[in-house]
Every structure is written in C-alpha cells, then in structure tokens.
Amino acid sequence: MERITIKEENTGITLFAALNNTVAAKYLAKRLPCTFSGSDSGIYFCCTASSGNYDPAETQTRWKNGDISLGGGWFAVLYGDEEQSAAYTDMMIVGHLEQDSLSKITLLPKRVKFTVDFA
C-alpha cells in the first residue's frame, strides 16, 4: 500500500491516505502527481477524473467514511453518510484517509483543487 498526500491547493491543507492494491489504485499511482478540481456535496468531495484501468470484480457497494474512490468519471473523497451509502453501487475504492486526515475534512472549502502525490 502506497502512502499518498491529497493537498488542497488554495488552503495548503494536506490529507494523508494509503492506496490499496486494486488495479485502479495501481493505475492512479502511475499517474501521480495529478490534480483534480471539484466541490463538496456535503458527504463527499467529488472531482471530475478519467476512470482509467480497473477490474470490475473489485468494485463494491457502499463506502466507509474516509474512503477514496476513482471511477465512473469521478475522483472522490468520501467522508460522510456511510450508513446510507448502500444506494451507491459499483464503487471503485482505491484508498482510505488516515484518521487524523479525516478529521481535517471540515476545514476544507466548498470548492477544491486537490493535488495528489506520493507522500
């Protein structure tokens, strides 16, 4: 598992996460550093992104707060509403925020520009 940073460029707030061993996470690692722009939905930060390579067998239903996904044209940092996330199918989870970083989510602005890179 590779450790990464997710830096919000306007505030300098940096989140730390670990990528998992999925095909999609390995594809993301090959693209680093990369930048994603998006906004806060109230339960996740959603940024447009090319999906890239992934194994459909590795997709899942639901997320855990702190998960990071890349799929369906989106890069997302999922931070809330885990209990209601069963409505979200075909989630391609590529990593998870470290606990200290999950608590920093509330400090981020509504519109974000994330630069993702190796820690």
Region spans (language model):
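Short, mixed charged/polar active-site loops
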Residues: 12-14
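Glycine-rich active-site loops that engage anionic ligands at enzyme catalytic sites
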Residues: 17, 21-24, 29-119
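A short beta-strand micro-motif
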Residues: 2-9
